[in-house]
Amino acid sequence: MALIMEPVSKWSPSQVVDWMKGLDDCLQQYIKNFEREKISGDQLLRITHQELEDLGVSRIGHQELILEAVDLLCALNYGLETENLKTLSHKLNASAKNLQNFITGRRRSGHYDGRTSRKLPNDFLTSVVDLIGAAKSLLAWLDRSPFAAVTDYSVTRNNVIQLCLELTTIVQQDCTVYETENKILHVCKTLSGVCDHIISLSSDPLVSQSAHLEVIQLANIKPSEGLGMYIKSTYDGLHVITGTTENSPADRCKKIHAGDEVIQVNHQTVVGWQLKNLVNALREDPSGVILTLKKRPQSMLTSAPALLKNMRWKPLALQPLIPRSPTSSVATPSSTISTPTKRDSSALQDLYIPPPPAEPYIPRDEKGNLPCEDLRGHMVGKPVHKGSESPNSFLDQEYRKRFNIVEEDTVLYCYEYEKGRSSSQGRRESTPTYGKLRPISMPVEYNWVGDYEDPNKMKRDSRRENSLLRYMSNEKIAQEEYMFQRNSKKDTGKKSKKKGDKSNSPTHYSLLPSLQMDALRQDIMGTPVPETTLYHTFQQSSLQHKSKKKNKGPIAGKSKRRISCKDLGRGDCEGWLWKKKDAKSYFSQKWKKYWFVLKDASLYWYINEEDEKAEGFISLPEFKIDRASECRKKYAFKACHPKIKSFYFAAEHLDDMNRWLNRINMLTAGYAERERIKQEQDYWSESDKEEADTPSTPKQDSPPPPYDTYPRPPSMSCASPYVEAKHSRLSSTETSQSQSSHEEFRQEVTGSSAVSPIRKTASQRRSWQDLIETPLTSSGLHYLQTLPLEDSVFSDSAAISPEHRRQSTLPTQKCHLQDHYGPYPLAESERMQVLNGNGGKPRSFTLPRDSGFNHCCLNAPVSACDPQDDVQPPEVEEEEEEEEEEGEAAGENIGEKSESREEKLGDSLQDLYRALEQASLSPLGEHRISTKMEYKLSFIKRCNDPVMNEKLHRLRILKSTLKAREGEVAIIDKVLDNPDLTSKEFQQWKQMYLDLFLDICQNTTSNDPLSISSEVDVITSSLAHTHSYIETHV
């Protein structure tokens, strides 16, 4: 180290001053004080808060900025030669065990009281901060090349981050000290296990090698060329190179690689500096620059190994076979990995990084204009990039006003490979890729050119932003479907077969070699690629507002489930697993065994290994994978999505479950962000042919079913921005959602041939998330469509006037559903009596538990029940008594109605059980105790008029609030009216009613919301800073 750079401890006061000039702007005011006191390098490394206070740095924030930069110098000065992944793991392991010992020692003391819920002591929080600091040092290594490209280390990094975030959440939870300590002990034991795993891999040279410094000189730099480096700066002042431009000075020297850390520029230490000051230092000498780089260990002892020599690697087909390190075989059983060669294909695909563009940054003249050649390119219509105007780039801030480039509006260029490219042409030297702009800030982990862009995809992308769910299951229609729907389904089935002919292979192209992607493109497109390279440009911000036309084509209609298990090939992980089925019947089997195949971040399941079609699949990057502790079945895990649904799986043994979780996390680590951008396939698809029964209430241990079967008119199928009908290719933007008209609704009701029966089936299915996110009516309450569509489909629209149809559930369709079903009985009671003059009675407007029971009672006279006549639970609280009074007031406005209800019971045991459940009776005929949800629904059932319901609801709120305030006033009057009040009595009263006293103080004093902050928020923000950075190109 002494031969390369002078140790920081040997710095003179002038060198300390020179280093401080590159720190944050707010610290420049203190340079004179440091210069006056002649602070040397050794004093700088040992400086404390008190010494900074003596130097005039009084603000805590400024002190922290200086100390953070000094910590980086300490790590450079003392830990460079000894710091490696193994020692960092030892430090984290020691911190975790120290925290465990601290908790154990506290419990052994005689003054320990674990039942209290007071805040944790400062020494406890200090140990937590030390633990997270040790974790950050380890993450700084795992988050960079070459460790970031190895799946085993990537999974370890994600686990450490998750545990640290969990630790920060635990210390700020409101629970007893004993419970908090137990949770922290569990996290510490898990962290120790992770560290032991890393330490056990001591045979891997990546674990035991230390970082080293290397001096690189770049000369003969043209003024218009630049250095050709992409530099990422973390929040605390570490500058990491993320890539180089091809044929640039940085690329030609063959010594600068992704993951290198810039330590010095022209022998001036820049650790802790601002990015703009680093850029100015690089531009200081136009003829050349001398860089001192800190290089991470590679797979060999040299600083430029073959596999990681440069980030523009050759395609995998041209690379020599290199023996894998033992780390990958530890976490991945060989029996579950596809092994066409001796190396792990999935790991090499994660390591593969395609060539970056040659000129992502075009220097402009002093006026900010592009060169003349580029202007000529614009004149002839060539796709010319705008340079490296990354939203994170400091260098481009002065030009942002001219081009208005923000993160959403960044123009991306995608290109297709030339036809008939041979293997020799795939090399970087012979095929320079000029004119391509890397996405935003060039993340080195992902393939930025490898995705096939279909021309029709541009039209489909506008839908993708607003419709999360693309549901494409080819489920069978229930036998209650009408004949014209069956006939239409046959025609649709023939078309779907033609569309699915070409979907016999997975359609994930990210992180694939260029030659393989070329072959896949030619196989799928079936048309010759033009001789010249094709360019497609699109803007991300315009995806939400562009095409609204219906898209057609073979790619748009294909389903990923139409691939046999044999054609899918050997997956990255496969085996038998249990899958939890949606509870469609009370007595149905909840779990079923399937053959699962994990392939390219997608999970397929088949009935057996020879099945010709997958029963379902999930695109895993869109789902969160975790243990399913809420299920009673052993070794269960789940794939959940907050907007779609959750899938539950279970393995036979604990090892199998861990193997599946590890493999899924490994494969989805590199896919997550990319799949979120390019997701043109479906998130999931599943066959429902074995479950055509009506749904029933699931057991207590199972989560709520993902959808219900309440029928609704077709116009409601796109009401939610998150749900789209099956096989529907119509746009789901806000504009198209609001364009439904009364004529279209009448046309759908009368059975127009243009309406797809599959869409009608999908319109009868609503997810629980859809129910939650259903827009409110003008009165603020949810009113759900509950009547079967069959009545409306076969009713004579001419015989019943639109005034007799039921009112709406959603604001955008209120007039349509009101015309279809008739008005409320409160406003149109006489007309309803004329309409039902044959002895029939108005419909019930309460929400049924199951629409399948309506099918059974389809031919029975439909009656309207008074909402007050439902079986009500006993009122045991004053709040329920208020509801009863309000319900009686509502009954006076509604008027007299018939109390009889005539329903024809179904023949099946299930329908009988559902009828008993609706009547709040047990199977033995005894009254069943109502649940909290039924208590809540009982109030909504009081009145069918939403306006009246809103008034009653508001009255109930006001009464409850008034009663609570009266009680508080009585408590306050008890103190104020006491003429003999003493200080002791007042202190006792204040302790007894502490919450009330704090409310009074809070209302009398104005609080600044910015002043309310938690101590642990600092810990969370410091951990989050590990991943916050800005990036530029020089």
Swiss-Prot record:
Where composition is biased (Basic residues), the residues are: 545-559
The job of this chain, per UniProt, is described as: May function as an adapter protein or regulator of Ras signaling pathways.
Compositional bias, Acidic residues, is annotated for 683-693, 875-889
Q: Which residues form the DUF1170 domain?
A: 332-515
Give compartment(s). Cytoplasm; Membrane
Q: Which UniProt keywords apply?
A: Coiled coil, Cytoplasm, Disease variant, Intellectual disability, Membrane, Phosphoprotein
Q: Which residues does the record list as Phosphotyrosine (modified residue)?
A: Y683
Protein name in the entry: Connector enhancer of kinase suppressor of ras 2
For this UniProt entry, what's an example GO CC term? Answer: plasma membrane
Q: Which residues carry this modification: Phosphoserine?
A: S12, S338, S390, S685, S687, S756, S767, S908
Question: How is the protein disposed in the membrane?
Answer: Peripheral membrane protein
Q: What does the annotation say about its assembly with partners?
A: Interacts with RAF1, RAB2L and RAL GTPase proteins.
The record names the disease as: Intellectual developmental disorder, X-linked, syndromic, Houge type: A disorder characterized by delayed development, intellectual disability, speech and language delay, and early-onset seizures. Carrier females may be mildly affected.
Q: Where is composition skewed (Low complexity) in this entry? A: 324-340, 730-740
- Where the record annotates domain PDZ, the positions are 215-297
Domain (PH) ranges: 570-669
Q: Name one GO molecular function term.
A: protein kinase binding
Which residue ranges does the record assign to the CRIC domain? 84-178
Q: Some GO term, biological process aspect, for this entry: which one?
A: regulation of signal transduction
The outcome of changing R46H is: In a colorectal cancer sample; somatic mutation
- Annotated source species: Homo sapiens (Human)
